[in-house]
Amino acid sequence: MNSPIMIACAHGTSSPLGAAEVNGLRADIAELRPGLDVREAYVDVQDPDLVDVMAGLPEGEPAVIVPLLLSVGFHTKVDIAKAARGRAGSSASEPLGPDPRLAEILDQRLREAGATEHDAVVLAAAGSTNPKASVSVEELAEHLRALRGNRIVPAYGAAATPSVPDAVASLRAEYPGGEGQGRVIIASYLLAHGFFHDQLAKAEADVVTEPLLPSRLMAEIALDRYDAAAAPGGEAAGEAGAAPRDADAAVEGAGEADAAAASTAPQKPLGTGALEQPNHAQPRGFFKAFRRFMTKYFPR
């Protein structure tokens, strides 16, 4: 019997570098599992859209959607879960995080950035209004504390508190930076380069690490999620339901984003404690939501 098709579903981004990094993750997955049919899909910003990919799968072939996202949120609980339920023989795995191996990647990024034991670390996630997303970031912070002796403060780009700029500001008096002084370092808990990663540079930390990708460990985690969901009686993601929507995280996906909701929610400017929101979010997110509404209620 053939293995189920893997739908490696990312959020989507307008960043060419971020898109290349996510495509590299899919390539790593395929290289680690020769013969596995790995399909590309997105829930926003990029094509092919997850709904279209699912509709185009061979009839009768089982499939597992693996969210290339770092925590639960609107897209995992609603968009992805609905896509899995809407096709016979399909399921959805849990997202990539939290996982101790993500802390290993963050530890490597901090070492690459020259972090020392005297520095404070702001663990910067995208953010979500779903409380489970913040819980998963706190869990990841505990994994990172087990690897490093630094003071580690979780913070968020949007939708949750503290914001990344606020966390940096609160640590600055204690960690002034400069030669011989403890610094404030942002550990980018974001999947790839994109809008939110670029915004981290505006938070006035001394150093910002690179995002999680590229890393082969990410492909190993994705395959573990796939295997758990594909196994008989496997550990699939929870059912869809009324879920809070998230601030638009573009490709980074730590608390993955819903662009349409983000575009209508008031956002603080960076100087008052929140990262700016991407300009591309509103049109793409709106038209995707409108298309789904029309498909559901006015089928051809």
Where are these regions (language model features)?
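Active-site-proximal alpha-helix that buttresses catalytic centers in soluble enzyme cores
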Residues: 1-300
